[in-house]
Amino acid sequence: MGASGVQMATRFVTTYECDADEAYKQSYIDAKKEDIVIVQSPVGMPGRAILNPFMKRAKEGQIPHGKCHLCISTCKPEQTPYCITEALVNAVKGRVDKALLFCGANAYRAVKLEHVRDIMEEFRPVEG
């Protein structure tokens, strides 16, 4: 009896085909196991992210609030440590030191850029 499918996302961030900014991809490659942490997002849900300078400042309450975009009804700007919209836009634009870098538990296992076809080849059954 074997698996009929798997769900993966993190593994494909560090592929040539992924349209994420190169600095975002490099953050995964540079991450160590202890850099992957559970964070509380401004919307009240926990998430897994890379502990970068932004997240360190957020934990210390050192990120000033700008204008609220009213993008998420559950967000309470007066109680949140940072604006999730700005943090995610920074990630998209490659400003990784000012970004929330969501990731999976095994993001630290990415060691290089590779092609999707090579990752998929790893899952092909071994003949014989």
Where are these regions (language model features)?
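Conserved active-site-proximal phosphate/metal-binding subdomains
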Residues: M1-G128
